Swiss-Prot record:
Taxonomic superkingdom: Eukaryota
Molecular function via GO: acetylcholine receptor inhibitor activity; toxin activity
Renumbered residue ranges of the record's region Ser-Xaa-Pro motif, crucial for potent interaction with nAChR: 9-11
Signal sequence bounds: none
Gene Ontology CC annotations of this record: extracellular region; host cell postsynaptic membrane
Subcellular location, principal: secreted
Record's comment describing the protein's domains: The cysteine framework is I (CC-C-C). Alpha4/7 pattern.
Cellular compartments annotated: Secreted
Protein's name according to its UniProt entry: Alpha-conotoxin CIC
Source organism of this protein record: Conus catus
Miscellaneous comment text of the record: Negative results: does not inhibit rat alpha-7/CHRNA7, alpha-4-beta-2/CHRNA4-CHRNB2, alpha-4-beta-4/CHRNA4-CHRNB4, alpha-3-beta-4/CHRNA3-CHRNB4, alpha-2-beta-2/CHRNA2-CHRNB2, alpha-2-beta-4/CHRNA2-CHRNB4, and alpha-1-beta-1-gamma-delta/CHRNA1-CHRNB1-CHRNG-CHRND acetylcholine receptors, as well as on human alpha-9-alpha-10/CHRNA9-CHRNA10 subtype.
């Protein structure tokens, strides 16, 4: 999903959702 892709580009979101990346 594009939302997960955007989260993958955000370091803060990546930390909170490391399982998505």
């Amino acid at each position: 999903a594009s939302g997960a892709d955007t989260c993958c580009s955000n370091p803060a979101c990546q930390v909170q959702h490391s399982d998505l990346c």
